Amino acid sequence: MAAFQEILDVLPGRLQTLDFSAAQELRLRVGQAPAVLENGRERRLSGLVRPGELDGILQRATNYSAHACQSALRQGYVTLPGGHRVGVCGSAVTRNGEMTGFRTVSSLCIRFARDIRLDETALLPSLTESCLILGAPGAGKTTLLRACIRALSNSGERVCVCDDRGEISAMTDEGAQFDLGPQTDVLTGAFKSEGMTLLLRAMSPTWIAADEITARRDLEAMEQISYCGVRLLATAHAKD
C-alpha cells in the first residue's frame, strides 16, 4: 500500500500518483494551484483546482453518504481512516445563529496524520500528578498527549479522554484511529467542560485528558474535578 493510501483514495486521479510521503498538509483552493506543506515549507503543484474536485473529495471522504457529508459540513471537517482530517472552508450557511453547513466549498485543508511513538517508559516517571503540556502551534503537543495517555493506560490507569474535536483519537465509525491504550475510554462531540464532568460521573477514571484548554469554563471544570481525586492531563498553547 502507498504511503497515506487513505488520502490518495479520496483525491482526484491527477493527484493520486504524487508522492506525499513527507507531506504535512495538502491545501486545495478553487482556482489556485494545489499546495503541499513539507517540513514546514510550502511548495506548489501544477494545475489549478476546479470546484467539482472539492465536491468529489468530500463525497469520497464520506463514502457518498449525503447524511455523513452534511454532518461533516456542519462541523467543518471529516476524519478519514488513519486519523487524517479534511478541513472545509467556503460560504457558510447559518440558522438561528448557528452554522449549519456550507452553500459552496472553496477550500480544503487535508492534514496528514502520523501516529508517532515515543518512549512510554521515559514518560511514566513524570506522570505522577496532574500535568499541563505547553507549546506553540505545531510543536507536537497532541502527539505527546497521546503518548502520555497510552503510557498511563498501558500501566493500568483508567484514562478517560474528552476529545471534543476528535483530534486525539481520530474517532470514526470503526473506532479510534490512534492507539490510546487498553484502559482508555473516549468521549467525542461534547464540549470539554461538560464532557469532562460527564466522564467523572459516569466512568470512574483515575485520569481525565483533554486537548487545547482555552475557555474559562474548561478551567473551572478541571478545578472541580481536581477536588475529586482525579488527575488531569491537558495541553494549552504557549510561546516557545
Feature-to-residue mapping (PLM):
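P-loop NTP-binding catalytic core
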Residues: G56, Y64-T128
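Hydrophobic positions on the alpha1 helix immediately C-terminal to the Walker A/P-loop
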Residues: L144, C148
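N-terminal accessory targeting/assembly segments
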Residues: M1-G82
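P-loop NTPase switch/communication element
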Residues: L152-L199
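Conserved P-loop NTPase nucleotide-binding/switch module
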Residues: M203-D240
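Hydrophobic anchor at the beta1->P-loop junction of P-loop NTPases
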Residues: I133
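The conserved Walker
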Residues: P137
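Conserved lysine of the Walker
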Residues: K141
